[in-house]
C-alpha cells in the first residue's frame, strides 16, 4: 500500500502535471483533491498540447482509475468539454470517477465571483480571481447550501435546492448580473441533463480509494495550484478558496493522514506567480523578462504573463514544513543556463530586523527586502543530458543548496518539458 501526494511548492504553475504524468505511469489510482476549473495543467497527447482544468493528469494512464475527489468544485460544462476534447484525441475517459460528495458550480457562482471582484476593484483591493465561480461555490459549501454531485441524480431534490439557492442569490446579486441568469426551469433542465450524462462517472470515491489501498495498490494524489495559494497557509487574501496543501489530500479525498507515505513538493528553479499579492523576490527587470520568454511563462488558464523572481529559500523552507515534504522535484533547471550568476533568497530584511521565517502579515511581506546568496551560474545546455553526473558542477551545487535550505532531498529534476527530460535520483514510490 502506497499513497503519494504531489503538491505545488510555490504559487502554482510549477509543472506538477508533468511530474504527475511521469509518476502516474506506475499508479493504480490518481486523485485530484482540491480546486476547480480555475487551476490549469498542460499535457501533451500525440504531439498535441491539451490544457485541462478539472480532469487529473492521470487520465493518460489507461489502466488506472482517475478520480475527481470530494474536495473539488466541479463546473459540469467545463468537465464535459474536457471529456470531449480528450476523446477527440483518442484518450478513453471510461476510467474517470467523480466523487458523489463533490460540490457543483452553477452560473450564479460565476456571476457572484464577478460581482465580488468588481466591488473589490472599486476599493483597490482586487485579488485577481479567474472569475470561474470557485470562491462562491466553496462559500455555499461552508454555508451548507451547496449542491453536490449526488444531487444531480435526484431530479426532485435538485430542483428544490436550485430554487432555494436562486432565492438566496437574488438578494445578493446586482440587478444587471441577476438578469443574466437562466430561469429556474431552464437551469434545472440543464443540470438534470448534466446528471444524465455524468451519472456513470459519479460514485463513492472515498470507498474506491480505500478498497485500492487495502489491495496494496499505488494511489497518487495530485494537488492543484500551490501551497502559497492555500486558503490557510498562503499569502492571504491573495489565495484560492481551498487547501492544495498535503493536508488537503486527506480531507479532499476522504482518507486518513496515516495512509500517506510520500509528500512530493514540485517547484521551479526560480519562482513564478500569476495575479496580485506580495512577491519578495520578484524581478521586474531584464532577469524576469528573460526567464519569462525562455520558459514561456504565461498562465495556462488566464494567459496572463506570470511574474518572475529568484528562488526563495525562506518560502521553500516554510512550504516543506507546512506539507511535511519527503521529496523535492525541481523543474526548469535548464531555464537558468546562460546566467553568469544566480541568486537564492536566504532571509528577509524587515523593519524589525532579519527574519528567516515566512511572515503572515501582507504588509510585512510587501516591505521585506530579500537577502540573497549569490551562486555561480553555468553556460551548458542541459536539455540533452540524461544523468545527474552529466550536470555541470555549478548546476549540481545549485540543487545541493536547495536541499540544504529546505532540508528535503531533491529526488528528481527536469531539464525540459518532455517526460523523458525528467531525471530521477530517488524512488518516490518506495514503501
Swiss-Prot record:
Which pathway does this chain act in? Purine metabolism; AMP biosynthesis via de novo pathway; AMP from IMP: step 1/2
Q: Pfam families annotated for this entry?
A: Adenylsucc_synt
Q: Which GO BP annotation is one of this protein's?
A: 'de novo' AMP biosynthetic process
Tell me its EC number(s), please: 6.3.4.4
Comp. bias regions, Basic and acidic residues: 115-125
Region (Disordered) residue spans: 114-133
Q: Which domain of life is it from?
A: Bacteria
**Does the keyword section mention GTP-binding?**
yes
Reactions the enzyme catalyzes: IMP + L-aspartate + GTP = N(6)-(1,2-dicarboxyethyl)-AMP + GDP + phosphate + 2 H(+)
Q: Where is the active site?
A: 13, 41
List positions binding substrate: 300-306
Q: Return the InterPro entries for the record.
A: Adenylosuccin_syn_GTP-bd, Adenylosuccin_syn_Lys_AS, Adenylosuccinate_synth_dom1, Adenylosuccinate_synth_dom2, Adenylosuccinate_synth_dom3, Adenylosuccinate_synthetase, P-loop_NTPase
Subcellular localization, per the record?
Answer: Cytoplasm
Question: Which annotated residues bind Mg(2+)?
Answer: 13, 40
Co-factor(s): Mg(2+)
**Major localization listed first in the record, in broad terms:** cytoplasm
Quote the record's binding site residues for IMP: 13-16, 38-41, 130, 144, 225, 240, 304
Q: Which GO terms describe its cellular component?
A: cytoplasm
Record-annotated residues binding GTP? 12-18, 40-42, 306, 332-334, 414-416
Q: How is the cofactor bound?
A: Binds 1 Mg(2+) ion per subunit.
Keyword Transferase, does the record have it? no
The GO molecular function terms of this record are: adenylosuccinate synthase activity; GTP binding; magnesium ion binding
Whom does it interact with, and what assembly results? Homodimer.
Give the record's family classification.
Answer: Belongs to the adenylosuccinate synthetase family.
Describe the function of this protein: Plays an important role in the de novo pathway of purine nucleotide biosynthesis. Catalyzes the first committed step in the biosynthesis of AMP from IMP.
The protein depicted here goes by the name Adenylosuccinate synthetase
Q: Which organism is it from?
A: Pediococcus pentosaceus (strain ATCC 25745 / CCUG 21536 / LMG 10740 / 183-1w)
Q: What is the lineage of its organism?
A: Bacteria, Bacillati, Bacillota, Bacilli, Lactobacillales
- The encoding gene is purA
Amino acid at each position: 500500500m502506497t499513497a503519494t501526494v504531489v503538491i505545488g511548492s510555490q504559487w502554482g504553475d510549477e509543472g506538477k502535471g508533468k511530474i504527475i504524468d511521469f509518476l502516474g505511469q506506475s499508479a493504480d489510482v490518481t486523485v485530484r483533491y482540491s480546486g476547480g476549473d480555475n487551476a490549469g495543467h498542460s499535457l501533451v497527447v500525440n504531439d498535441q498540447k491539451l490544457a485541462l482544468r478539472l480532469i487529473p493528469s492521470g487520465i493518460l494512464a489507461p489502466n488506472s482509475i482517475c478520480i475527481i475527489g470530494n474536495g473539488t468544485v466541479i463546473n459540469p460544462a467545463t468537465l464535459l468539454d474536457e471529456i470531449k476534447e480528450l476523446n477527440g484525441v483518442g484518450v478513453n475517459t471510461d476510467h474517470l470517477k467523480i466523487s458523489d460528495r463533490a460540490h457543483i458550480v452553477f452560473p450564479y457562482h460565476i456571476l457572484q465571483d464577478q460581482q465580488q471582484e468588481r466591488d473589490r476593484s472599486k476599493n483597490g483591493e482586487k485579488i485577481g480571481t479567474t472569475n470561474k465561480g470557485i470562491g462562491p461555490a466553496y462559500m455555499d459549501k461552508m454555508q451548507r447550501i451547496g449542491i453536490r454531485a449526488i444531487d444531480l441524480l435526484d431530479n426532485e431534490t435538485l430542483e428544490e435546492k436550485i430554487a432555494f439557492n436562486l432565492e438566496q442569490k437574488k438578494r445578493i446579486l446586482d440587478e444587471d448580473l441577476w438578469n443574466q441568469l437562466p430561469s429556474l426551469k431552464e437551469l434545472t433542465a440543464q443540470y438534470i441533463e448534466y446528471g444524465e450524462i455524468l451519472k456513470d462517472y459519479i460514485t463513492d470515491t472515498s470507498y474506491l480509494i480505500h478498497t485500492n489501498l487495502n489491495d496494496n495498490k499505488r494511489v497518487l494524489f495530485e494537488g492543484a495550484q500551490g501551497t502559497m495559494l492555500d486558503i490557510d497557509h498562503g499569502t492571504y487574501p491573495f489565495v484560492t478558496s481551498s487547501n492544495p496543501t498535503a493536508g488537503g489530500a486527506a480531507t479532499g479525498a476522504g482518507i486518513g493522514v496515516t495512509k500517506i507515505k510520500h509528500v512530493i513538493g514540485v517547484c521551479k528553479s526560480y519562482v513564478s506567480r500569476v495575479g496580485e499579492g506580495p512577491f519578495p523576490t520578484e524581478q521586474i527587470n531584464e532577469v524576469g523578462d528573460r526567464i519569462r520568454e525562455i520558459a514561456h511563462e504565461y498562465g495556462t488558464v488566464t494567459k496572463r504573463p506570470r511574474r518572475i523572481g529568484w528562488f526563495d529559500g525562506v518560502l521553500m523552507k516554510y512550504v516543506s514544513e507546512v506539507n511535511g515534504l519527503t521529496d523535492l522535484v525541481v523543474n526548469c533547471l535548464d531555464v537558468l543556463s546562460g546566467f553568469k550568476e544566480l541568486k537564492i533568497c536566504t532571509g528577509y530584511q524587515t523593519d524589525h530586523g532579519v527574519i528567516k521565517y515566512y511572515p503572515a502579515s501582507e504588509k510585512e511581506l510587501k516591505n521585506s527586502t530579500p537577502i540573497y546568496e549569490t551562486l555561480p551560474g553555468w553556460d551548458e545546455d542541459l536539455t540533452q543530458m540524461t544523468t545527474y553526473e552529466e550536470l555541470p558542477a555549478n548546476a549540481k551545487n545549485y540543487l545541493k543548496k536547495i536541499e540544504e535550505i529546505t532540508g528535503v532531498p531533491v529526488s528528481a529534476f527536469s531539464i525540459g518539458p518532455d517526460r523523458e527530460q525528467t531525471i530521477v535520483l530517488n524512488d518516490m514510490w518506495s514503501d
